[in-house]
Amino acid sequence: MIVSYIVAMSNTQASSVSTRQRGRPREFDVDLAIDKAIGVFAERGFHATSVGDLSEAMELTQGSLYKAFKDKKDIYIAAVERYKLVQTKRFEAAVQTGKTGREKLLAGMNFYAEACVGRSGGQGCLVVGAAADLASLDDDMARVVRGAIDAREKILARLVREGQADGSVSKAMDADALAKTALCLLYGMRVVGKTGLSKQQLSAIVEIAMKVFD
């Protein structure tokens, strides 16, 4: 189960997340296997995903899985950590196409809007889905999910402050409050994107969302 954003992740030159090395070296690409697991977890969530689902998607026997990971929870944590790592790099690259803070925020909005189209949109975002299930996750899993959410919010806060400094974003509102509002808008797009929004609808949503920075 490999979708468009997972292909992009596999081609990204990112540092490998901790893969909890144990025993003899494994004869498969751990990052590539985790990328495939991300698609399953994003679409089904942690609880509805079985080890059999992961074994099939990752194209590994359950024996190979258990040599690399302790259990399903271990795979999930590795998936969230890798998703955070790679998606943060992609998001940072996208926003840097803007010149002002506002233009960078717009680029960030468009980054999420583009992810809402097609198969990626229908599948949803791993972190957004995990946030909705946060109450049902144990402390270890909840911690890595919150870490991914906090990382995105920190980038948004930085861009808001950059915009306020260069005059492209209003100073009437607190920067942290604006960043959290932007985070809610971005994550909300990913949730509603699962219903099959058109590019035109998403474009209109982004246009209206940007008004919070006026």
Task: Report each predicted region and the residues it spans.
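Amphipathic alpha-helical segments used for helix-helix packing
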Residues: 104, 119-140
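Recognition helices and adjacent regulatory flanks at domain boundaries
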Residues: 26-27, 38, 42-44, 52-53, ...
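Amphipathic C-terminal alpha-helical segment
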Residues: 115-117, 158, 162, 182-199, ...
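Hydrophobic alpha-helical segments that form the core
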Residues: 6, 123, 128, 171-192, ...
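N-terminal intrinsically disordered/low-complexity leader segments
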Residues: 1-28, 172-173
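Helix-turn-helix
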Residues: 10, 32, 36, 40-74, ...
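Amphipathic alpha-helical packing segments from all-alpha helical-bundle domains
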Residues: 85-88, 103-106, 139-165, 177
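Hydrophobic alpha-helical connector segments
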Residues: 78, 92-123, 175-182
